[in-house]
Amino acid sequence: MHGLLLAGLLALPLNVLAHPTESHSSGISRRAIDITSYRLPQISKYTKSDSLTGQDGQSFTASSADADTSSGDYVSTATNWLKKTLPNASYRLVNDHYIGDSGIGHVHFRQTAHGIDIDNTDFNVNIGRDGKVFSFGNSFYDGEIPKANPMVKRDFSDPVDALHGAIQTLNIPVTAKPENVKAKPVEGKESFKFEGTSGALSDPKAQLVYLQKDGGLVLSWKVETDVGDNWLLSYVDANDKGKVHSVVDYVSAAAYEVYPWGINDPTEGKRSTIHVPWFKTQSVDWHIDGKNWYPTTRGNNAIAQENPTGQREYENNYRPKSPLFIFKYPYSEAMSPPSSYRDASITQLFYTTNVFHDVLYILGFNEKAGNFQTNNWNKGGLGGDYAILNSQDGSGVNNANFATPPDGEPGRMRMYNWNASTPERDGCFEAGIVIHEYTHGVSNRLTGGPANSRCLAALESGGMGEGWSDFFATAIRLKNGDTRATDYTMGEWASNRPNGIRKYRYSTNLTTNPHMYVDADGLTSVHAIGTIWASMLYEMLWNLIDKHGKGDVSKVKPTLKNGVPTDGRHLAMKIVLDGMALQPCLPNFVQARDAIIDADKNLTGGSNKCEIWKAFAKRGLGVGAVYNPSKRTGSNELPAGC
């Protein structure tokens, strides 16, 4: 799950914000089950573009890095590269490959054994504009494959037993009485949908998979349950329903009289009426999905409504209607209760989310890359996955979260009210919270490919997920007069905390924010780790702004020349997005740094290499930095030439 928790606002197991002093406030955490102890292991490797080194000591020189392109397309090139790198591996091509706006082809593979997926093994190949392998990531299992094919003797438990095991072990609020539950086969090998349950937002599912764990493979049932605050993949031992090996959570704890884009919250400016704010090349119209024209806060990219009871249903929930598409409603900080300004809240949430969708589209998060749209207009990717936006959601307080299933399934944002002030405040009016949450959807779709939403499930990967979300929220709120001496908080207005919800402000001053890479040692909160990562990205942001300028931040639409943003602010965002698509599944800081440097190399020929390296090295992620989950090695070293 993804969200804001305070200091941790970003500390829930959802992609949520996180609160520094409060315990987890929703979902599984409410039931005293710590699913963070079930995280997937961090096993990925990333081979960057300027040092292609294969497995088993095999070195690829610049000339030998030319993959076989005789078959004519980037997917074949990637497939041949995998065959060359791991000639004995069994695998399948994941059907989510695409060529990004930066010209890089992204191809993803899943390892198999006896025709069964090894679910946490991934191989991603990035093909450059020249048709050659640019970089690749690998988490394939290199141990001995079990000799016995479990499908021959069907030596595994019934999927219904696995469902019961997940429910009982993790205390999932789903009722599945043995006499009522039936496992109905669906498309896919040993894949089932459970009928006769209650408590989940959709029918639970199960698929037989292997899981790479502790140096071996364990046959498991991957049980999927969406209960709102948690959308879980629980890997239950196929022969012992009481043993859960790992857990992934998809939830990562907007016409329009609104606070305009760039105004973070009511302390920074006034509401105004924005006319036709969408970018016509990115959104035909925010209220059209190709079949219908909705005179309400619904359209191709998002559907926004109130949800005061915190229920799972949303389509019939209240949302403002305007046959003339004039969404102007009263709001002031003094109004109370929140229900008295629900129309303004829903409209603000719909506006902020749609603008961010359009900005991200220009920067490369489009249909092929797995963005959130009902209709993909025949441009690739899977449609049917607008973002569900719940304003004033009654399932929690003092937080927010975003659930990110794979491409083709709608994402879901839950925005809560905050009660640390009188009257209480609505998180929909703090743009940074909305942007933070939506960015969880972006980072989960880009990392590991649109079809794989579990690639930020390891501790350090999940921490970077929180950091990317804070980074975008902060970069977007910059003002024309800001300099590298400007510091920013996160969640300050909603939480009513002058210093916000993070341990330190985001600052380039090491006295104000002393975070270093090695500070991640011993941390178990993704939100605390994320603050370190976002601090590094904030350094990079200002290095690029100092070199390229930040442009006129009052202009919403990014300006690109030959696919490259002309200002340093949007250039930083673009490089970060491209890096997400390059990096391996379950990356660590070092691998994500290398992917960002590779992204700039592909986008600009590496013209910003030193600015990027200086940002990371300043906070201990220089050339000599080494990842070790218990004792990281910091480095301030710069590469030659910088």
UniProtKB/Swiss-Prot annotation:
Q: Name the needed cofactors.
A: Zn(2+)
Give the Low complexity compositional bias ranges.
61-71
Q: Where is this region: Disordered?
A: 49-72
Subcellular locations according to the entry: Secreted
Q: Where is the signal peptide?
A: 1-18
Question: Which InterPro entries does this one have?
Answer: FTP_domain (IPR011096), Fungal_virulence_M36 (IPR050371), Peptidase_M36 (IPR001842), Peptidase_M4/M1_CTD_sf (IPR027268)
* Pro-piece positions: 19-253
Q: Which GO terms describe its biological process?
A: proteolysis
Q: Where is the composition biased (Polar residues)?
A: 49-60
What PANTHER family does the entry give?
A: EXTRACELLULAR METALLOPROTEINASE MEP
| Family statement drawn from the similarity comment of this UniProt entry | Belongs to the peptidase M36 family.
User: What's the name of the protein?
Assistant: Extracellular metalloproteinase 4
Which source organism does the UniProt entry give?
Arthroderma gypseum (strain ATCC MYA-4604 / CBS 118893) (Microsporum gypseum)
- Give the source lineage, highest ranks first: Eukaryota, Fungi, Dikarya, Ascomycota, Pezizomycotina
Gene encoding the protein? MEP4
